[in-house]
Design a protein with these regions (language model features):
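Residues within helix-turn-helix
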Residues: 42-43, 54, 61, 81
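Basic amphipathic alpha-helical segments that dock to polyanions
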Residues: 32, 45, 60-66
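Short helix-to-turn junction characteristic of helix-turn-helix DNA-binding domains
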Residues: 4, 8, 35-38
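Active-site phosphate/pyrophosphate-handling residues
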Residues: 2, 30, 54, 116
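N-terminal helix-turn-helix DNA-binding core of bacterial DNA-binding proteins
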Residues: 13-52
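Ser/Thr-centric signal marking residues that sit
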Residues: 25, 57, 86
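Charged, amphipathic alpha-helical coiled-coil/dimerization segments
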Residues: 12, 61-126, 130
Length: 132
């Protein structure tokens, strides 16, 4: 667990500096990273970010003012607002990832097989639902 804590600390520090280089807070940068996977409803975004809905509203308001995201009504329920990354939001997200040198350099020290194995292990530990 200690190694996981250290690795997450390095990643978070690297991410925070990279987001700051785009004049974003870590929370704003993380929101863009989540949206890079695809549009999300405001409620789902708050759950994913583990924050209060009012907090996510403020984050989205600031990102929207910068033209990085936009709100769109959901096709099946117009009361629901989905948040969508704009082309500029995609560019900024990619720029943040590109600036994460410490993380990228660490991962580059792994061969393809080791990277695939790390990805599979992380997915098994943090993403996959336990069978049952």
């Amino acid at each position: 667990m200690e190694l996981l804590s250290v690795s997450l600390g390095v990643y978070y520090g690297d991410f925070t500096l990279a987001a700051a280089s785009e004049n974003l807070t870590a929370s704003q940068g993380r929101t863009l990273a989540v949206l890079r996977r695809g549009p999300a409803a405001m409620r789902a975004l708050a759950e994913t970010m583990t924050c209060d809905a009012s907090n996510i509203t403020g984050i989205i308001d600031r990102l929207e003012k910068r033209g990085l995201v936009r709100r769109e009504p959901d096709a099946s329920d117009r009361r629901v607002k989905n948040v969508v990354l704009t082309a500029e939001g995609e560019r900024v997200t990619d720029a943040i990832r590109a600036r994460m040198r410490t993380t990228r350099d660490g991962l580059d020290r792994l061969g393809d097989q080791d990277r695939d194995r790390l990805c599979a292990l992380l997915e098994r530990v943090f993403v996959s639902e336990p069978a049952g």
